[in-house]
């Protein structure tokens, strides 16, 4: 019974990483196969060969007739059936242990990267790659292993092989001695001198156990088929809902996450300005490029705009005929747009911004005085 307990401990670990159908299958395997085989069935077949009698005194005739009637004992046959049926499940358990080992290595590497991140090293991409590997292996946040990818394929293959082994052993059992036992077996083999009759001990009790084990095998086969369809339709459902691959990887690397909340600067006509992220309805050719506001082309653009504003202001005052000297475009001082760092440095140093001089303090020439005193057609008469 020590071998049975070791097998039971291994299969008990499989139950933690199986579906509902897999857990029911394991319960059937434990209760109706291993437990029953280790208690009632083994005791019923305990006197199988010793109680097999033939109506002859020829030495060796009973052994030869028993070997012909039962090439393999029912108990040993069912033990082989349980072992073969359990092997695919144990292989799936080995895959689970492999995934758990990978999880330990990834967690250790993730801790090392986080320690390096605290020292100022940029390891964000490596951490994302570790998350993708965990997702590929089916590792959840709290160490739980979920069936997906290679683990799911291994589970499906194990179900297929379990079903194949169940069908194969049922056919072998039917071919060797059927599903019932008779009380009398006729034998004619050397060294028997003639055809002899051999008698089996407790044939009815053994037939009941054979039928019971047959029903258990059919139930296990039905559970495997139901579980196979369940896993298949669940996988299709997850793909329809788009839950199969939440991470998007391109050429082995993560695609960068788009930050829509941060404000960026984009170049318009060679100058940068704060702008919001592009909307989905932007035309294909509209591609603002993020850049720095301290570009020399931008400063020239701002200077030209300032000079044009002063020229427009002077022309407007000349047109309205307002008193006072006009402001010439050549004497206008353009606004300067220093960057934020320069402003902060100046303010920190205690310097204040000087206001722009918008009135020309030079005396007007005689030509300009005579020109300004001449009446114009658009002047108002008082």
From Swiss-Prot:
Post-translational modification: Phosphorylation at Ser-325, Ser-328 and Ser-330 by CK1 modulates gap junction assembly. Phosphorylated at Ser-368 by PRKCG; phosphorylation induces disassembly of gap junction plaques and inhibition of gap junction activity. Phosphorylation at Ser-368 by PRKCD triggers its internalization into small vesicles leading to proteasome-mediated degradation. Sumoylated with SUMO1, SUMO2 and SUMO3, which may regulate the level of functional Cx43 gap junctions at the plasma membrane. May be desumoylated by SENP1 or SENP2.
Location of Phosphotyrosine modifications: 247
Record keyword Cytoplasm present: no
Pfam families: Connexin, Connexin43
Extracellular-facing ranges: 45-76, 177-207
Cytoplasmic side: 2-23, 98-155, 229-382
Keywords, alphabetical: Acetylation, Cell junction, Cell membrane, Disulfide bond, Endoplasmic reticulum, Gap junction, Isopeptide bond, Membrane, Phosphoprotein, S-nitrosylation, Transmembrane, Transmembrane helix, Ubl conjugation
Gene Ontology CC terms: apical plasma membrane; connexin complex; endoplasmic reticulum; intercalated disc; plasma membrane
Positions of post-translational Phosphoserine modification: 5, 255, 262, 306, 314, 325, 328, 330, 344, 365, 368-369, 373
Region of interest called Interaction with UBQLN4, as start-end residue ranges on this chain: 264-382
Disulfides per UniProt: 54-192, 187-198
Covalent cross-link (Glycyl lysine isopeptide (Lys-Gly) (interchain with G-Cter in SUMO)), residues: 144, 237
Region (Interaction with NOV): 244-382
UniProt keyword annotation of S-adenosyl-L-methionine present: no
Stretches with biased composition (Low complexity): 362-374
GO biological process: bone development; bone remodeling; cell communication by electrical coupling; cell-cell signaling; heart development; negative regulation of cell growth; regulation of apoptotic process; spermatogenesis
Subunit structure: A connexon is composed of a hexamer of connexins. Interacts with SGSM3. Interacts with RIC1/CIP150. Interacts with CNST and CSNK1D. Interacts (via C-terminus) with TJP1. Interacts (via C-terminus) with SRC (via SH3 domain). Interacts (not ubiquitinated) with UBQLN4 (via UBA domain). Interacts with NOV. Interacts with TMEM65. Interacts with ANK3/ANKG and PKP2.
Role summary: Gap junction protein that acts as a regulator of bladder capacity. A gap junction consists of a cluster of closely packed pairs of transmembrane channels, the connexons, through which materials of low MW diffuse from one cell to a neighboring cell. May play a critical role in the physiology of hearing by participating in the recycling of potassium to the cochlear endolymph. Negative regulator of bladder functional capacity: acts by enhancing intercellular electrical and chemical transmission, thus sensitizing bladder muscles to cholinergic neural stimuli and causing them to contract.
The protein's name: Gap junction alpha-1 protein
Species name: Macaca fascicularis (Crab-eating macaque)
Lineage: Eukaryota, Metazoa, Chordata, Craniata, Vertebrata
Gene: GJA1
């Amino acid at each position: 019974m020590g071998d049975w307990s070791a097998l039971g401990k291994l299969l008990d670990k499989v139950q933690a990483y199986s579906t509902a159908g897999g857990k029911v299958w394991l319960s059937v395997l434990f209760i109706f196969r291993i437990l029953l085989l280790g208690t009632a069935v083994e005791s019923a077949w305990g006197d199988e060969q010793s109680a097999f009698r033939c109506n002859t005194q020829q030495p060796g005739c009973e052994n030869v007739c028993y070997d012909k009637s039962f090439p393999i004992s029912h108990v040993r046959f069912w033990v082989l059936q349980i072992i073969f049926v359990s092997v695919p499940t144990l292989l799936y358990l080995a895959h689970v242990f492999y995934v758990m080992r990978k999880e330990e290595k990834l967690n250790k590497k993730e801790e090392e990267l986080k320690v390096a991140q605290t020292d100022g090293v940029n390891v964000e991409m490596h951490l994302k790659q570790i998350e993708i590997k965990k997702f590929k292996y089916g590792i959840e946040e709290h160490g739980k292993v979920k069936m997906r990818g290679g683990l799911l394929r291994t589970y499906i293959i194990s179900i297929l092989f379990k079903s194949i082994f169940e069908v194969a052993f049922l056919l072998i059992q039917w071919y060797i001695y059927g599903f019932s036992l008779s009380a009398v077996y006729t034998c004619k083999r050397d060294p028997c001198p003639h055809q002899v009759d051999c008698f089996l001990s407790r044939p009815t009790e053994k037939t009941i156990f054979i039928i019971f084990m047959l029903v258990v095998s059919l139930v296990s086969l039905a559970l495997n088929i139901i579980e196979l369809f369940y896993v298949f339709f669940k996988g299709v459902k997850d793909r329809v809902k788009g839950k199969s691959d939440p991470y998007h990887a391109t050429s082995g690397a993560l695609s960068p996450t788009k930050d829509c909340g941060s404000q960026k600067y984009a170049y318009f006509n060679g100058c940068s300005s704060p702008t919001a992220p592009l909307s989905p309805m932007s035309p294909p050719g509209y591609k603002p490029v993020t850049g720095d506001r301290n570009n020399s082309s931008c400063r020239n653009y701002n200077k030209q705009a300032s000079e044009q504003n002063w020229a427009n202001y002077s022309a407007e005052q000349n047109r309205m005929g307002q008193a006072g000297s006009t402001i010439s475009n050549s004497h206008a001082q353009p606004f300067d747009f220093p960057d934020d760092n320069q402003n902060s440095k100046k303010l920190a140093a205690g310097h204040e911004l000087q206001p722009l001089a918008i009135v020309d303090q030079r005396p007007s020439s005689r030509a300009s005085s005579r020109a300004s005193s001449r009446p114009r057609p658009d002047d108002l008469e008082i």
